[in-house]
Amino acid sequence: MALETCLRGWALYAPQAGIRERLSSGSYAPSRPRTAAPAVVSPSPYKSALVAARRPSRFVCKCKNVVDEVIVADEKNWDNMVIACESPVLVEFWAPWCGPCRMIAPVIDELAKDYVGKIKCCKVNTDDCPNIASTYGIRSIPTVLMFKDGEKKESVIGAVPKTTLCTIIDKYIGS
């Protein structure tokens, strides 16, 4: 998903039409090998546009390691996903049998898409990972914790509206 978003952004800044063709998979790819064309000095603006179209693009994808979906965190990947993460991390503690957890799950999914590239969203099943839950004092579910620089900054207990979580996220993505 992140790569597709990145490629869509790249396609928007393509120099000229015809250099890229839409593939059946929905992604964009060069229609011919990109080689540097020799610069042609010409009084005609049309020829200079053609030369610019043949130049290799200076495309730099800044979407590296960006995920627009909720990632399942467990005891094996907890440190890498949450503690060592440079961006803020929203973690939902949940259980499959919990009704309010099922109500807030779509909200967390939306937040992952709305804040793609700004935060990482993870979820921890408290039945599968009781040690993580007890480390952070999770006694009720759903509980949402906000981490920044590996430290727990804020917590929200219960199925809360999306606006409540957005307010918390906005506090930590700007600072």
From Swiss-Prot:
Annotated GO MF terms: protein-disulfide reductase activity
- Domain Thioredoxin, by residue range, is 63-174
Residue range covered by the transit peptide: 1-62
Between which residues do disulfide bridges form?
98-101
Keywords associated with the record: Chloroplast, Disulfide bond, Electron transport, Plastid, Redox-active center, Transit peptide, Transport
What does the record list as coiled-coil region(s)? none
One GO cellular component, as annotated: cytoplasm
| Primary location group | plastid
Q: Where in the cell is it found?
A: Plastid, Chloroplast
The record lists the membrane-crossing segments as: none
Q: How does it assemble?
A: Forms a complex with heterodimeric ferredoxin-thioredoxin reductase (FTR) and ferredoxin.
PANTHER family per the record? GEO12009P1, THIOREDOXIN M5, CHLOROPLASTIC
Q: What name does this protein carry?
A: Thioredoxin M-type, chloroplastic
Q: Which organism is it from?
A: Triticum aestivum
